[in-house]
């Protein structure tokens, strides 16, 4: 499992940057503050990833289905599904099995709040 920035994913960084640029109307920045706040949550090794900001709002989710981590399929998380719990429910309803997988979060304000919810199997990266 990994927690990293979008640009550190081999083969997927450009795809993700283009996608997020479209989401923000063509605006993509690389400031130090944004690198800290844009977190990549790994829901499982190499297959499902969710991009969220520092407040826990899920912005984008996609599936990487090959060993090179190319993002060959994705599931856009609409505004009404921009909370992490709802995104997990959305991915599960799409047929992605998350029952045996651990959600890895960096210890931010968002992860502390989410970890307090019942029903989540969380391992903090410290």
Regions found by a protein language model. Give the residues of each.
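Conserved acetyl-CoA binding element of GNAT-fold acetyltransferases
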Residues: 68-79
């Amino acid at each position: 499992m990994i927690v990293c920035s979008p640009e550190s994913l081999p083969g997927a960084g450009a795809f993700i940057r283009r996608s997020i640029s479209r989401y923000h109307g063509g605006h993509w920045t690389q400031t130090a503050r944004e690198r800290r706040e844009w977190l990549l949550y790994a829901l499982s090794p190499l297959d499902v990833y969710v991009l969220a900001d520092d407040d826990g709002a899920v912005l984008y989710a996609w599936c990487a289905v090959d060993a090179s981590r190319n993002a060959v399929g994705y599931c856009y998380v609409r505004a009404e599904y921009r909370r992490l719990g709802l995104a997990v429910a959305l991915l599960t309803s799409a047929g992605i099995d998350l029952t045996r997988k651990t959600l890895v979060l960096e210890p931010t304000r968002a992860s502390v709040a989410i970890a307090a919810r019942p029903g989540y199997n969380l391992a903090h990266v410290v």
